[in-house]
Amino acid sequence: MVPSPQEVKDALHERLLGHLTHPDPVYQALLQEYPSRGGKMLRGLLVIYAGLAHGATLEASLWAGTALELFQNWVLIHDDIEDGSEERRGRPALHRLYPMPLALNAGDALHGEMWGLLIRGLNEGLFGPEVLAEFHQVVHRTAYGQHLDLLWTLSGHLDLTPEDYLRMVAHKAAYYTAVAPLRLGALLSAKTPPALYEEAGLKLGIAFQIMDDVLNLEGDQAYGKELAGDLYEGKRTLILIRYLQEAPKEERIRAEALLSLPREAKPEAEVRWLWQNLLVSGAVAWAKEEARRLAQEGLGALIPYLDTLPGREATSHLQNLLTALVERRA
């Protein structure tokens, strides 16, 4: 019998924390801080149900799902440091709770633990080396997407197009969010992932990230991230790019002047002005429609193929999770 999403989530959480114990209580607290905050664990759930849908064992699927959740947590620690973020999952970012060098080191430790977990799974015969190769792709592509995102902000680059955003976010977020879980599901059962998984998965992952950008402007504290934090961090979101393309010249000049300032120098009143302008400009509605279109195309291509997989009950859970991924409200 296939476990329920809540049962899988509980197992993931238990395994995550279980892999991060240490006799030094301060070190353990640093390692467990982000994993202990919970979260939806969507990526880990996707890996597990994709594995079961393809015929992989529950143990192998749990092992790989735990590794992807470890990836998510160490990447978030580094991302928060690089962006100067204030909050993560409704609480202060790790580098706001501890000195930054300790937070950075904790992220490095989680990265190492991810590879250690995968090597042990390989040595125990749970999966083959192609699973580790896929994790290398995850790290490589995410790092390149982060490079583009940071470079645009640090260089003050604002003359961007929607196509620039789509290329960046395909690497930074979409691959590890939707493509890798589907590919890992096939690899865990020693099958070759179809090209469809990357083609459709990128559309779903991009739709997810666009809605993440929307929620940063329209969300509330339940969302678990600093509201309008993307504006303080100067993120080049699809919404902002569209707004700058369409705004009157005076508004655009004022917005660009604000975005050129470092976070600590951005006046709150000016950030609020830009935030309100984005909400009423039509850029948010346009971005939502783009997300809806991409999600519809991605799901429309994937579901007929997923219906052919051997694990019918797991496939049903997988399809529900993919739908929830792109219909998120928080």
Which residue ranges define each predicted feature?
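N-terminal amphipathic/basic leader segments beginning at the initiator methionine
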Residues: 1-19
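A non-catalytic, amphipathic alpha-helix used as a structural packing/dimerization or gating element
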Residues: 7, 11, 134, 171, ...
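Mg2+-dependent prenyl diphosphate-binding active-site environment of isoprenoid biosynthetic enzymes
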Residues: 17-252, 323
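Hydrophobic, well-ordered secondary-structure elements that form the walls
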Residues: 240, 298, 318
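Mobile late-domain/C-terminal helix-loop "cap" segments
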Residues: 253-305
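Short, amphipathic C-terminal "tail helix"
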Residues: 294, 309-330
